[in-house]
């Protein structure tokens, strides 16, 4: 602010020398004259003009009137007249509003400046700055410091700039030689630019200074532009900002270089294929996304690379992105919504992991949740200023994307907690979550997904968070009533949402349905309450398998989000448990086995280049294969549980909520492993009962096999393997050279026809194995089986009554097996079951095969696998049975040799701590 009036003189203490009568006395009432003159009328009078002229003359003639006046130095400049009272305090004391004696101590400094060693200066034009201005200056200084730190620490960028400058100078002067110009040419940059953001100082980790190297780099001459501190996706989407984006020719992360055109292809692939599963970001180009957030950009590129025929790019980026996330989120606390969105994407399409504890997705979700709370995402954009003071240029849609990010964090928290069997840390809803139920601006699928996750949170809070029991579960006697109410509420929610059938939302709805059934199957629940949910669990699981089997026709399994893949995994584990249970209806057993085989082949039938990738898909396939080996080697582990009349469907685990199903099956694998170690070197006794194993083959790839999937009218998905022409020709050539049966990747060719159904065993058995009193084996068309429809609602209600009468029927079966069998055979229409015996002498009573395997006294052995008529004619039964047996013996050789280390699926389960019961 400029002053229109002259500055008041500041004089030292009065001296004995006579003063000029025209000079006003300093710091005395004489000072009031100019103040009073200011208050007078602005009309010019001769008297006023004469006073002003005298005052200006006296001011100009006074040597001590210059300003700013440093104490002890004569003033050297004049100032405009002000008319205010003279300034007697130094600038420091005026800024802090404290008493100052600078005028009294002149020419010495005031007491405070003298004590603090400051330069005491009196400046009438100085005006104290406001607090907000100081804060703004501090922000500017911090930003400058960050830029300086980046330039000083980043040697490569400075070297590149200097070399570029020298090269230009040399080319202009044309004085340097070829070798000198080559030295001056910028080298192929081994850029180690660390990840920088608008809210964290740059981090550069050199190889000789830190064990964690920086992995981020970008090839561009201009310095890196900082992200918008608003952190909202739409803040950079204005036309002005798009024009200001720095052009980027290629993107570099560690040793991975991605050209711009390739980055745009992967960016568009993600936006069209993957983003609809969880629409939480908006982006128009790869360059725009990179300028928003490097971590978000690379997370999108990593996810889109799942569609590549070769996993080279995906595997190269996986470890680098994990390191980048550590640099971004742990070394410095990010304040960016984009970082939260990147963590969500990395949790929905997880990084490669071999064991459960190796999966860092749950930690990413927890970090995203904590950052969201710190940034105020749970309170919406209306209160953003209460959580951050540096929000800049909020876009018109910033609140929308911030809200979607918070909704996605809530969904991921509920899903991953259920997957791991942990109570969710977000166990209550808020305004944004409740409003999302009716918010029509949200995409329908996303809104339905959030509504289902809210119900999922309620389900776990009611059934799995209790303070009256150490396992946290609801009292067993109260579970049936609560589950019945929750099941009806879920059905009302389905009617209200009206989601599309056969889509991802129905898959997640059925997954929650299975969670309700799992709570009913936990130990302690009365048996009569468990059997009510057996049919519901079977129908939900087979429906999930059918839907996903159709979805993979349009998108590969590995590209599906984790919440769909986990639904399939949970379904196959549920079916595996149910098909060994005494409570599953007989006619559902074959269908359950075929669905299990379908899922295993779906998980294993991938491209050969991707077969070594370790993730949740490969882990599920390994668990199924190990469970199948338990069926083959130690069937008593399952039989003992099934024969116990009081045992639950889930027999042991209960403290992992709905994940207890997975841990219960893993216990069976570890128990079989423990027994194999104890039986090493001993002659293994043949079990009295042997369960027909499932036709699992882990050597199947899309290069050698094609899968043909069909769905019967009753909802059963059946998958058969068909070898490719190339694989068939190679198998024939090997078989001709070695005079061995046809095999493809070690799999006998006749075994490819097996789909998991036990009826195939009946069709392949020779007539000599049938007992004399049994009817002859007849062939029945498959159309009769396909005419079975899904059980109606009345049949599901009758199922509980059938299960309650089951024990009485079993007792009568044991007392009069022959009469019971004849009665069942006569009452049935054209028979779908048949009686066979393990040995010709009929040492065991007859049984009903296939549709109710475990309650019987005999199960088919491995040598009764499916055989085509051609194989029967060419080969005898014994060589073929030996071939099948050798196949499974080779797969289980690790159990007996104690060299199989692939059964530690959890990463922490110690089998030596589990005592045999």
From Swiss-Prot:
Keyword set includes Coiled coil: yes
GO molecular function annotations of the record: DNA-binding transcription activator activity; DNA-binding transcription factor activity, RNA polymerase II-specific; transcription cis-regulatory region binding; zinc ion binding
This protein's name: Transcriptional regulatory protein SEF1
Bias-annotated ranges (Pro residues): 13-27
Keywords (A to Z) from UniProt: Coiled coil, Cytoplasm, DNA-binding, Iron, Metal-binding, Nucleus, Phosphoprotein, Transcription, Transcription regulation, Virulence, Zinc
UniProt record, GO biological process: biological process involved in interaction with host; cellular response to alkaline pH; DNA repair; DNA-templated transcription; filamentous growth; intracellular iron ion homeostasis; positive regulation of filamentous growth of a population of unicellular organisms in response to biotic stimulus; regulation of cellular response to iron ion starvation
Description of how the protein assembles with itself and partners: Interacts with SSN3 and SFU1.
Subcellular location: Cytoplasm; Nucleus
Record PANTHER family: FINGER DOMAIN PROTEIN, PUTATIVE-RELATED, TRANSCRIPTION FACTOR SEF1-RELATED
InterPro entries on file: prtT, Transcription_factor_dom_fun, Zn2-C6_fun-type_DNA-bd_sf, Zn2Cys6_DnaBD
């Amino acid at each position: 602010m400029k002053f229109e009036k002259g500055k008041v003189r500041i004089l030292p203490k009065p001296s004995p020398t006579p003063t000029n009568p025209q000079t006003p006395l300093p710091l005395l009432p004489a000072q009031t004259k100019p103040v009073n003159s200011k208050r007078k009328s602005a009309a010019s009078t001769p008297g006023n003009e004469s006073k002003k002229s005298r005052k200006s003359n006296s001011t100009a003639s006074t040597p001590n009137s210059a300003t700013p006046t440093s104490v002890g130095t004569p003033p050297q400049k004049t100032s405009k007249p002000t008319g205010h009272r003279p300034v007697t305090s130094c600038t420091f004391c005026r800024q802090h509003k404290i008493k100052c004696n600078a005028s009294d101590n002149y020419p010495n400094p005031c007491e405070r400046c003298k004590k603090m060693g400051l330069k005491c200066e009196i400046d009438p034009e100085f005006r104290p700055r406001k607090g907000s201005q100081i804060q703004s200056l501090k922000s500017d200084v911090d930003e400058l410091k960050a830029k300086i730190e980046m330039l000083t620490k980043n040697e490569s960028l400075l070297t590149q700039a200097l070399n570029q400058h020298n090269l230009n100078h040399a080319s202009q002067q044309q004085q340097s030689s070829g070798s000198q110009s080559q030295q001056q040419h910028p080298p192929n940059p081994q850029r180690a630019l660390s990840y920088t953001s608008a809210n964290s100082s740059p981090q550069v980790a050199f190889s000789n200074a830190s064990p964690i190297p920086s992995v981020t780099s970008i090839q561009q001459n201009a310095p890196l532009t900082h992200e918008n501190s608003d952190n909202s996706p739409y803040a950079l989407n204005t036309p002005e900002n798009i024009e200001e984006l720095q052009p980027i020719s290629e993107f570099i992360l560690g040793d991975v270089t991605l050209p711009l055109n390739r980055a745009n292809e992967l960016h568009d692939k993600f936006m069209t294929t993957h983003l609809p599963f969880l629409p939480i970001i908006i982006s128009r180009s790869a360059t725009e996304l990179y300028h928003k957030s490097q971590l978000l950009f690379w997370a999108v590129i990593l996810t889109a690379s799942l569609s590549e025929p070769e996993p080279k790019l995906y595997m190269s980026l996986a470890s680098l992105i994990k390191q980048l996330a550590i640099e971004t989120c742990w070394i410095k606390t990010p304040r960016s919504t984009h970082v939260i969105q990147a963590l969500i994407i990395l949790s929905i399409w997880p990084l490669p992991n071999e064991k459960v504890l190796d999966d860092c997705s749950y930690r990413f979700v927890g970090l995203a949740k904590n950052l969201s709370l710190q940034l105020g995402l749970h309170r919406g954009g209306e209160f953003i200023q209460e959580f951050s003071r540096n929000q800049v240029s909020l876009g018109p849609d910033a609140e929308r994307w911030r809200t979607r990010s918070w909704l996605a964090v809530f969904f991921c928290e509920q899903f991953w907690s259920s997957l791991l069997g942990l109570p969710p840390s977000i166990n209550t809803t808020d305004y944004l979550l409740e409003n999302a139920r009716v918010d029509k601006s949200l995409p329908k699928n996303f809104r339905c997904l959030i509504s289902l996750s809210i119900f999922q949170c309620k389900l776990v809070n009611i059934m799995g968070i209790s303070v009256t029991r150490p396992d946290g579960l609801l009292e067993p006697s109260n579970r049936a009533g609560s589950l019945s109410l929750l099941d009806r509420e879920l059905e009302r929610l389905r009617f209200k949402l009206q989601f599309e059938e056969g889509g991802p939302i129905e898959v997640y709805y059925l997954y929650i349905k299975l969670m309700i059934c799992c709570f009913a199957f936990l130990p302690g629940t009365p048996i009569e309450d468990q059997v009510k949910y057996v049919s519901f669990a079977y129908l939900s699981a087979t429906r999930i398998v059918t839907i996903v089997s159709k979805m993979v026709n349009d998108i590969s399994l590995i590209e599906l989000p984790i919440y769909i893949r986990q639904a399939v995994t949970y379904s196959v584990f549920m079916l595996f448990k149910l098909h060994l249970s005494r409570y599953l209806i007989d006619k559902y057993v074959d269908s359950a086995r075929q669905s299990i085989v379908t899922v295993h082949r779906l998980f294993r039938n991938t491209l050969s280049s991707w077969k070594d990738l370790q993730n949740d898909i490969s882990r599920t396939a390994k668990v199924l294969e190990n469970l199948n080996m338990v069926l083959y080697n130690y069937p008593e582990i399952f039989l003992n549980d099934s024969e116990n009349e009081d045992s639950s469907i889930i027999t042991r685990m209960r403290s992992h909520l709905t994940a207890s199903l997975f841990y219960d099956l893993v216990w069976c694998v570890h128990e079989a492993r423990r027994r194999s170690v104890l039986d090493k070197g001993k002659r293994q006794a043949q079990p009295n009962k042997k369960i027909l194993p499932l036709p699992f083959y882990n050597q199947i790839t899309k290069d050698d096999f094609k899968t043909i999937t069909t769905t019967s009218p009753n909802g059963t998905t059946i998958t058969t393997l068909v070898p490719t022409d190339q694989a068939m020709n190679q198998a024939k050539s090997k078989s001709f050279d070695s005079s061995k049966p046809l095999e493809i990747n070690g799999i006998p060719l006749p075994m490819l026809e097996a789909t998991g159904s036990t009826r195939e065993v009946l069709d392949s058995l020779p007539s000599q194995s049938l007992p004399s009193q049994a009817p002859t084996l007849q062939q029945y068309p498959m159309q009769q089986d396909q005419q079975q429809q899904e059980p109606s609602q009345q049949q599901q209600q009758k199922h509980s009554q059938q299960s309650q009468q089951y024990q009485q029927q079993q007792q009568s079966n044991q007392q009069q097996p022959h009469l019971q069998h004849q009665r069942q055979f006569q009452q049935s229409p054209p028979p779908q079951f048949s009686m066979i015996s393990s040995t010709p002498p009929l040492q065991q009573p007859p049984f009903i095969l296939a549709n109710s395997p475990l309650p019987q006294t005999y199960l088919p052995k491995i040598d009764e696998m499916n055989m085509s008529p051609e194989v029967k004619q060419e080969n005898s039964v014994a060589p073929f049975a030996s071939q099948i047996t050798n196949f499974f013996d080779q797969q289980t050789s690790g159990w007996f040799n104690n060299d199989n280390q692939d059964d530690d699926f959890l990463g922490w389960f110690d089998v030596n701590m589990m005592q045999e019961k």
